[in-house]
């Protein structure tokens, strides 16, 4: 069912495609010439972007990007586009995008004011909240509850940035940065740390994949709002317009609901659609994330 806001977003995305400056169409021209697109994907950002047991890159974000590829095919009037997948980590995703190694980043990347200086973002496709994963015997209801705890951080993430800013002020804790979410989660499970702050959806995905939901707590305390979006190169207006159009179409038609249920309502994991996520479908937007309790952007 088409909402008024989704209809307007779709019309805007359609209009953007026909008002593009020539210099902004480089990636679309490359795709037309090579008939290939490279998607930047994650190894273990379940359920958004991960490698399954069959060694395939799958997930909610991956499906959204594949939907965008179909839209690109229609725009370029191509019968087929070869899709290549390239694994990226948190610290690598922006450098690899800017270097041209990937064309779209299809993971769990938060749209932030700082990142907007380097890249462009699509419409929001999910809104997470930063929370804290702990063993069952640790309860986190305020930042002060983290004082004195050894804490794991994942490199190149908004949680690393936020907790680094908090350290030495409101937060007095031992921070250890790990290469990725999987390593930080492993440190928690092995007892090397007692807390792991990260987006709640990713924490639940890690715990569900490990069949450890009953042994862990995800804090009621939410430290930030984390709107996820597809990343493209800064100024790549032609490609961004088509990605936005593909998202606006499935939001307006309601197809997004079935896609959401496919990845967030499974035997292993159930994540109810939050109000902010639903609002992003009915009122497509590109609002940046914010550390809501601390009063600054992330």
Annotate the PLM regions.
Residues 66, 78-145, 281-296:
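Acidic, polar ligand-binding/catalytic clefts
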Residues 19-21:
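N-terminal signal peptide c-region/cleavage motif recognized by signal peptidases
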Residues 92, 106-117, 162-167, 187-190, ...:
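A ligand-binding cleft/hinge motif common to bilobed small-molecule-binding domains
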Residues 44-47, 57-74, 110, 128-181, ...:
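Bilobed "Venus flytrap"/periplasmic-binding protein-like clamshell domains
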Residues 43, 126-134, 200, 208-247, ...:
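Periplasmic-binding protein-like
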Residues 24-54, 139-140, 144-149, 282-298:
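Immediate post-signal peptide segment of exported/extracytoplasmic ligand-binding proteins
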Residues 29-105:
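Extracytoplasmic small-molecule ligand-binding "clamshell" domains
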Residues 63-71, 144, 149-150, 155-157, ...:
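Extended ligand-binding regions for polar small-molecule ligands
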């Amino acid at each position: 069912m088409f909402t008024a806001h989704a209809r307007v977003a779709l019309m805007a995305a359609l209009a953007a495609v026909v008002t593009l400056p020539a210099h902004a169409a480089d990636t679309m021209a490359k795709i037309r010439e090579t008939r290939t697109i490279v998607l930047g994907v994650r190894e273990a950002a379940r359920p958004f972007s991960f490698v399954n047991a069959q060694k395939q890159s799958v997930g909610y974000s991956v499906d959204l990007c594949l939907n965008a590829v179909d839209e690109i095919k229609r725009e370029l009037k191509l019968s087929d586009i070869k899709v290549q997948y390239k694994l990226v980590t948190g610290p690598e995703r922006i450098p690899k995008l800017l270097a041209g190694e990937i064309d779209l980043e299809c993971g769990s990347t938060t749209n932030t004011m700082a990142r907007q200086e380097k890249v462009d973002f699509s419409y929001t496709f999910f809104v997470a909240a930063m929370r804290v994963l702990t063993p069952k015997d640790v309860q986190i209801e305020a930042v002060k509850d983290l004082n004195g705890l050894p804490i794991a951080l994942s490199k190149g993430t908004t949680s690393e940035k936020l907790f680094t800013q908090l350290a030495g002020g409101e937060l007095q804790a031992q921070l250890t940065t790990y290469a990725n979410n999987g390593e930080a989660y492993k440190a928690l499970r092995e007892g090397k740390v007692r807390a792991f702050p990260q987006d709640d959806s990713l924490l639940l995905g890690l715990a569900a994949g490990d069949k450890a939901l009953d042994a862990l707590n995800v804090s009621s305390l939410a430290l930030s709002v984390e709107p996820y979006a597809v990343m493209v190169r800064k100024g790549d207006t032609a490609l961004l317009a088509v990605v936005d159009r593909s998202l606006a179409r499935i939001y307006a038609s309601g197809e997004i609901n079935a896609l959401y249920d496919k990845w967030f309502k499974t035997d292993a994991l159930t994540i109810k659609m939050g109000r902010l996520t639903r609002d992003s479908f009915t009122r497509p937007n590109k609002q940046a994330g914010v550390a809501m309790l601390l009063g600054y952007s992330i």
